[in-house]
Structure formats: C-alpha cells, structure tokens
C-alpha cells in the first residue's frame, strides 16, 4: 500500500488539468491515455463522434514511464488494474443517472510500452464495452477512470446486476459506492470526452 501511495504521488507530478469532469467523483488529475480506432486519441473534455468510439479503446499510462526513466519499471509487476467507462448524462424524467458502458478488471501494465492489456488467463466477470449512443440533444460526458485492483479482488455481489449488456441493467451504476464496497484506493488516472447525436 505504501508503494502504491508513492506511485500515485509521483504520477501527480505530471498533472496539468483535471482528467475528470467538474463535479465527478472520484476525481483525478492524472492522465489515462485513451486511443480509439484509427488512432483517435482522447483529450480531456474534447468531443468525439460516436462512430469514432464504437469499439473498446487502447489504454496506456505513458505518464508513469515519463516519470521513471530507468529500465526497471517503478510499479510492481504483479499489480493489476481495472477500468470503467461511464456516461454521466443519461436523463430520465428530468433526473440524470450514470450508465455503465465498460468495466474491465485484470488489466496488466507493460513497463516497456506503458500500455494496458487484459491478463491472458483472466476469468473475472466484466461488463462488455458498449460505445456511446446518446439521444439527439446536448452532448453526453463519457468518463474513463482506472484503479489499482486489490489483491484477491472479487466483484461486489451488489454490482453483478450491472454486467448484463442492456441499458436497463447498466443504468444507475454508482461508481462511488462501487469504490467503497470493493475497497479501492483513489483512481490511478482518468480521461473523458463528449459525444452528441445531431
């Protein structure tokens, strides 16, 4: 835990602007690299077309490698991570609800490239990626946030219902409650983008 706290503190040295939308919790100023198909890279708060984000992105923590310039990676090689993507602007009867678009545990970090990939023997429950598809109207905010995965981690039972690939199942996902029940620390990094349907 001490090593992870030092890891987060050093990553904070790379911060520039907030990497999560105003008011979003848990917030972070640490940059998560998010690159969609055709090399479309997410810059915090910028707009993407829905078809640019229709497939799951490649994630990276290049900011970690920018801090640690030696051949030996600073992070511990046994660490795993989990990522979430959430639409925080789904409206029902005048009230906004968060919609889970993606939950992927068992991500491992390459110390050489800074890229995150799914552990080859992962059998953890997950929520398959669903691209943005907001209704016509104002742009929706899509937040990606990544956490260090605790050792001996298990998905909290209360959240199994959100894994089904339907809007009805995934609506109302409470990331703050998930963090509490899963015993997660503060986010390692985040990013977010806007998507609108004309």
Curated annotation (Swiss-Prot):
Glycosylation sites: 93
Signal peptide: 1-18
InterPro entries per the UniProt record, alphabetical: PEBP, PEBP-like_sf, PEBP_euk
A Pfam family hit: PBP
Keyword set, alphabetical order: Glycoprotein, Signal
An example Gene Ontology biological process: regulation of proteolysis
Recorded family membership: Belongs to the tstN family.
Protein name, UniProt field: Phomoidride biosynthesis cluster protein N
Residues forming coiled coils: none
Practical use: Phomoidrides A and B (also known as CP-225,917 and CP-263,114) are potent inhibitors of Ras farnesyltransferase and squalene synthase. CP-225,917 and CP-263,114 inhibit Ras farnesyl transferase from rat brain with IC(50) values of 6 uM and 20 uoM, respectively. CP-225,917 inhibits squalene synthase with an IC(50) value of 43 uM and CP-263,114 with an IC(50) of 160 uM.
Species per Swiss-Prot/TrEMBL record: Talaromyces stipitatus (strain ATCC 10500 / CBS 375.48 / QM 6759 / NRRL 1006)
Encoding gene per record: tstN
Gene Ontology MF terms: peptidase inhibitor activity; phospholipid binding
Superkingdom of the organism of origin: Eukaryota
Function: Phosphatidylethanolamine-binding protein; part of the gene cluster that mediates the biosynthesis of the antihypercholesterolemic agents phomoidrides which are dimeric anhydrides. Within the pathway, tstNB is not essential for dimerization and its function has still to be determined. The pathway begins with the highly reducing polyketide synthase tstA that catalyzes the formation of a C12-fatty acyl-ACP, starting from one acetate and 5 malonate units. The hydrolase tstM is involved in the release of the C12-fatty acyl chain from phiA.
């Amino acid at each position: 835990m001490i090593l992870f706290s030092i890891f987060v503190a050093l990553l904070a040295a790379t911060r520039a602007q907030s990497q999560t939308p105003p008011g979003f919790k848990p917030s972070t100023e640490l940059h998560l690299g998010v690159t969609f198909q055709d090399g479309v890279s997410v810059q915090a708060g910028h707009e993407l077309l829905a078809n640019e984000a229709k497939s799951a992105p490649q994630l990276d923590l290049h900011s970690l490698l920018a801090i640690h310039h030696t051949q030996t990676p600073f992070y511990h090689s046994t660490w795993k991570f989990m990522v979430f993507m959430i639409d925080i602007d789904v409206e029902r009867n005048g009230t906004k609800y968060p919609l889970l678009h993606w939950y992927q545990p068992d991500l491992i970090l390459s110390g050489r490239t800074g890229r995150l990939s799914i552990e080859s023997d992962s059998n953890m429950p997950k929520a398959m990626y669903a691209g943005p598809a907001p209704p016509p109207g104002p742009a929706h905010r899509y937040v990606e946030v990544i956490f260090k995965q605790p050792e001996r981690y298990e998905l909290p039972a209360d959240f199994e219902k959100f894994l089904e690939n339907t809007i009805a199942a995934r609506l109302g996902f409470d990331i703050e409650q998930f963090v509490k029940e899963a015993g997660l620390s503060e986010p390692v990094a985040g990013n977010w983008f806007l998507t609108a349907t004309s």
